[in-house]
């Protein structure tokens, strides 16, 4: 057989069989081309990556074919750089010029060999060269094979968007050689599979069924090279079954595309169908490219657009579930919460508004209406075109949260069925898989839980699943109990599916060793699953001979389960925690080696109805379980299960889920409407079917229940009866539904249910202790979330008490945190039906049991649901209107502090809690309260192991809290147990914060020696150093961040200055990690920024000079690679010790509040860290993330695996992804530079590219490059400069974080680096920084020092601005001319114009509105904005000077003296400091009363008529009266200031009077030990610094500005 022969499948398009599909086709391709497309010149266009692999084979195949055809044609090759950048006008023109240079004529045949980029580019060249020449597509990626190569679309990209310039130009042939796929990364194959799945979904349901049922074989054929014959698959005779499957699905996809193109070549209607998933997918891709591939984005789009169709009532949930599982089977993401997406910096830009905005320009749209291809079932679309869909429908699908619009259900009376029971579905899957024969299961729940169960059973080779009736029926071919282990290295991942984990534990124990290649199976799950108990089941199995190992925490997943471990015989099992343990053994018992007798121990058996359900179902599959009785005929908890093999019934119908039915029934109860559940009645196997009769009927509902249906009619709204005492043990999952009803049940409970000692309107639910170990601690969750409505609750050992309140008195606008728990979300949806504006934060958690719950709520029940986009990823779950007493913080998880005894956890924790307006708790104190012993006493009596157990139990309770400003210091040894470590790791994995507080070992030892032994701290029994060494790796592994506690003063600081600096850094750190304040400058072209590059080997000697060094800089670059413990600059690549780096960074933090750029520069990139040690580089970079640096530099030269791992840990830190070319070989107009930029944008929030200028021309090329890449929508900030003297102009023109130096630094970090002052002066000279004029308005102002203050700042930084006085008693024409002048830079405003200026401004800050005065005018984008910096100055003066011990503002008071205009700023500042009471004194009380009346009551202002009788001594005293108004002399005419006012041991006195420098108040306070004084001139400076920074965007050079003022002041 000739080597140029092959068995190909030919597909017709536009009347020609021009698509040829097969394997190993190169010889066939060139034989076909040379014989059917004769030419004088064949031009191959490919990229450099592919040419390196295939070019020799191409040339050989061409030469052989040409020789056989006696063809003397030329074979020319043109290579382009790989990547999307090649699809440009520039590259197209270069190809055309090259072809013309090579004398190519109209008979030229162009061959496009590559992916979509090459195909699109080459096709457009062919369409336009010589007005059109023939071309051939030879696609190499699966995406190109099934999509871009078929249909004749060709195009290039422009700065305005992708594919905007092109033509329809059909190729002469499309050769699809599937053998090329075996050289692709698995991710690229999956990328193409998204399009294959999409096509099957819209057109070919049989291909879709093949794709979902044979995914493993299809994936194997696409990714594995054949063994033996290298060309296996070229002919049918040597083609494997897997290859045939791959060929079938790929050719089927191509056929659909070809058929549609044939009917609608120019995309006028039908061809739009192939864009299913693309409307939303393209929008996602526009934000995430290039980090996420096209197919990955389309995969998410497919699921979301399917959900749109489901929401519209067009598509069933079964179809959505099938699509989701099929895409997942090929490794594709299916939601925006996929870890691969959330780990990307760009994911923060995936707002609903942004995506909808991008969708506006979709080519399918007609005008403003958005069009989406809607499925009606698998294999068929709703219309033969894209359908118009409203924005609110799309928005609801995209939003992560929903709000239920409180109203009476419009569809009442309602008759509906709920999804299949999760409990029955999971049992049916196990029974049918273990049984013999085929079973058709109907009404199976299609959810996350059942999906993982099915996937696991397939991995165990226990069953084959397929679908009928459009997916409504699942066909199970049982394996008869023959199971084998998954493939090597494959774990069974179960997510948070508790039922599946428990059932599969026993299933895995019965796996046959003889049928397996591996000795054991590992089952695992997500972080929460690893906390849920499974110990009693494992104990029972191991006692029975099974070998089960805990791989992490004892008592929880993951488990390693050996084969052949289910011996049988007599098994004892503790069943007081979960009935699922019992069901697990029951279901598998018939296959044990011996007949099983199962004895339940441990007291009352939980959820007996579910055990009865399991036994009843086993009987339907042929196994009859006998429950034994005692001599009196009473049932015992002993079950005998015969050995047998299940026989599958031909059909099995899953009963609807009774737990899910409680929600629509409860909605009827709470809204006074009627609902009938058509397929659950009194004959149900499920315990929750009793909910209507036993819960709703006693609450006042009319309940009508038959064997198969349940009808509920609720009483009038607001008349539900309380439950009183009720046992919900038979239906524990339904307690959440009962709880939300009890919250608004205000009529007295039935007399027989009354609980002594509780009100008649209380509901006491018991028998639900197991609900603490479900998806979350549901009892605690219910209490925390009900509190947001103002509902009071209590709990006891196995239940909860709810005190009902009228719904009218409840808080509106609560934002409900769902804990990823479906039942929490659906329960609060019930309450939301009468409490408006309630937000359910995690709408998707309902997918566990009722994926289309929100759609059914609107479409079937008639309660409107709207999408809600939360403000941030850690949006508050505690917001409510009116403001409730619950914490209003941004993050909803507590902050844990860990670290060695003596590291400073209490010191840091107290400051952190105060800064976050929260609570501090020492876990050891909680332990002492609960155990009534100190830790030392407890350890002495019970030992360390028992203490660690109790300590971990306390930790577990804290973890369940949802108060983001609760700071908890844990004991130093919390990391000693695996369980506690895993709990902390899980907390971090969920986005929680665990901060390792640390100090140098010797510092901690010295501190502990200084305080000696204490009664509350037990001895370790080993040396401190040994304990430190053992725990340090655990602290690192369990924490998200690290806070290095520097207790000694740095940079010449006094003790007082050090204390202030520590508080400032503590505030920055904790506000930063919790997302409250980023401490980063605004990066934009209009706001040029720079950072100072520190080049010291040891920064500590320079800290005293840091204020001067950082003048004009917006950040400080901490060059880690230049550090050295010797204090000498490193001369060869070396790694500074991490502990040394951490301390250096912490010391630097105490000397500056500027953001830090944490840079670890490798040798090849111009630094001193070795370039061959990725692990060490990664460790140093991760330290920057752990220490909460605002920016971390990440070199993109390192392996992608390292880069990906670092980006996933970034949290609030912004990554500066960098590339430095020290050779000068990379040209700014070259493709390599574009490729580096793409890489930097992929990994960074900021891209940094540094070239080397050889001439001034390189700066011009750089400017062109920046202009091109920054013109793309969504482009990230770009720092692009040239090194060398010739590149200095690029530094002057660069607006984003320009690296700068200072004359006092030991060296410049890079050649050509300039100082900040030099850059600003150069910008002024070149006109890029125009001179602005600043003024002070008011009268009298002749003696004002404001011009000195601001002009000193301008001069220090090299700014060309000026500040002058403009005296005026009113806002006259002269004032208006100044503020409307084009060179107006800003204004200070003093009396009498602070109020008069407001009508002439475009906007005023909320602060200034409340105060009623503007003292600063700021031009912003052609508009004038008013601000008040007076209150900011007062606030700063108080906060910085208050002693840390006096910082419990919430329980302290402040005093403001005076009722003039400035007092309002002082009151506002004290309110912002959270003082519980603000005393206001004025000599004329009536004026003080007027001031009080103008502020909200929440400010708690108390007018006092005498300073001698204050109810409580204040912590802060602010005087706003003239300097001589107060007196210490009782006989003086002024206001007498009694000493009692300053009787607090510590405090701050602030006098706003400009002169005298030391007023009576300040003199008195100065004599009081512990009191700090702030004179008026300091307030003037502080408010001026704020103004300077608002106007210039630069940090004020405070020392020099203050000096200029004080020199004049004291002159």
UniProtKB/Swiss-Prot annotation:
Cellular component per GO, a single term: cytoplasm
Cofactor: binding comment: Binds 2 Zn(2+) ions per subunit.
Active site: 267, 282, 845, 1220, 1248
Residue numbers binding ATP: 899-906
Enzyme Commission number(s): 4.2.3.4, 2.5.1.19, 2.7.1.71, 4.2.1.10
Main localization category: cytoplasm
Keywords attached to this entry: Amino-acid biosynthesis, Aromatic amino acid biosynthesis, ATP-binding, Cytoplasm, Kinase, Lyase, Metal-binding, Multifunctional enzyme, NADP, Nucleotide-binding, Oxidoreductase, Transferase, Zinc
Cofactor(s) listed in the protein's UniProt record: Zn(2+)
Start and end residues of each stretch annotated as Shikimate dehydrogenase: 1331-1611
PANTHER family assigned: AROM/DEHYDROQUINATE SYNTHASE, PENTAFUNCTIONAL AROM POLYPEPTIDE
Entry similarity comment: In the N-terminal section; belongs to the sugar phosphate cyclases superfamily. Dehydroquinate synthase family. In the 2nd section; belongs to the EPSP synthase family.
Protein name: Pentafunctional AROM polypeptide
Species whose genome carries this gene: Cryptococcus neoformans var. neoformans serotype D (strain JEC21 / ATCC MYA-565)
Lineage, opening ranks: Eukaryota, Fungi, Dikarya, Basidiomycota, Agaricomycotina
